[in-house]
């Protein structure tokens, strides 16, 4: 699959996870509604689904990975930043096929696109500290 299709999958995953985090609806319902309402012709839909289910299933684990590196409480994080960090930490911890730098760079771009003005700096700071611990020998 083309890198652009993966990037679009991540963008869609941020939006769907944002909805899931706010609504607390079943992730399968969020996925179904998102795919029914959005144009996904240039999206790696399989990867989108994998990100959604992987993050939802592992959200407590992923939150535990980020907590030591947060400058504030997890509950104080913006929903966009939380979704972006969860995706990146899922890729770093569960997807060895995604290169270390790709996961971080994609997260920074997602934060620039969807986050508040300086959220990309916050995301970068958290991932710069967490990534070497998660993947100590795989840069």
UniProtKB/Swiss-Prot annotation:
Annotated CDD domains: Terminator_NusB (cd00619)
Pfam families in UniProt: NusB (PF01029)
Gene Ontology CC terms, in alphabetical order: cytosol
GO BP terms, alphabetized: DNA-templated transcription termination; transcription antitermination
Alphabetized InterPro entries for the sequence: NusB-like_sf, NusB_fam, NusB_RsmB_TIM44
Family annotation (SUPFAM superfamilies): NusB-like (SSF48013)
Molecular function per GO: RNA binding
Gene3D superfamilies: NusB-like
Record has Transcription as a keyword: yes
Keywords: RNA-binding, Transcription, Transcription antitermination, Transcription regulation
Family membership noted in the UniProt record: Belongs to the NusB family.
Physiological role: Involved in transcription antitermination. Required for transcription of ribosomal RNA (rRNA) genes. Binds specifically to the boxA antiterminator sequence of the ribosomal RNA (rrn) operons.
Protein name: Transcription antitermination protein NusB
Species assigned in the record: Klebsiella pneumoniae subsp. pneumoniae (strain ATCC 700721 / MGH 78578)
Name of encoding gene: nusB
